[in-house]
């Protein structure tokens, strides 16, 4: 699934002749495996329906948003989400917000569906945390190497 998602993401970002369709075929295969409708069928009743892939590609297109959402869902417990968000440079959108979760102390289905805001605060320091520090030993070996900003 990760290869199909990466392929779909690359095709959508490339946004050239036929690549949007190729990428969405891979994404729809993942959705089909999970028993879900295709992207077009799922989004046809939305406020801004997707009736054609053309015009929805590129880094800021609707298809990019969809493939990112699918990636977060499909790779949920594989510890990939944190790295994807950093790679997409969306730390402020996903990390510097209140943490929400389920009410796990509930005794019925209605209680579980209640969203709780947790007191924990996650701080993501942008742009610093988009990069990792280069180990000091490596920087000292090469006088031409410069440490990443703010480290």
Describe these PLM feature segments.
Residues 2-151:
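Acidic/polar-rich alpha-helix caps and helix-coil junctions
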């Amino acid at each position: 699934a990760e290869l199909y998602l990466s392929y779909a993401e690359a095709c959508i970002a490339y946004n050239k002749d036929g690549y949007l369709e190729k990428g969405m075929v891979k994404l729809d295969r993942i959705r089909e495996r999970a028993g879900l409708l295709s992207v077009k069928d799922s989004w046809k009743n939305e406020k801004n329906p997707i009736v054609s892939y053309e015009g929805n590609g590129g880094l800021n297109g609707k298809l990019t948003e969809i493939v990112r959402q699918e990636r977060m869902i499909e790779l949920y417990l594989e510890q990939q989400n944190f790295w994807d968000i950093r790679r997409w440079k969306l730390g402020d959108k996903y990390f510097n917000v209140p943490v929400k979760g389920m009410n796990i102390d509930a005794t019925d289905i209605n209680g579980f569906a209640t969203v709780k805001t947790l007191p924990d605060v996650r701080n993501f320091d942008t742009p610093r945390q988009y990069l990792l520090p280069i180990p000091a030993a490596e920087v000292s070996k090469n006088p031409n190497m410069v440490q990443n900003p703010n480290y």
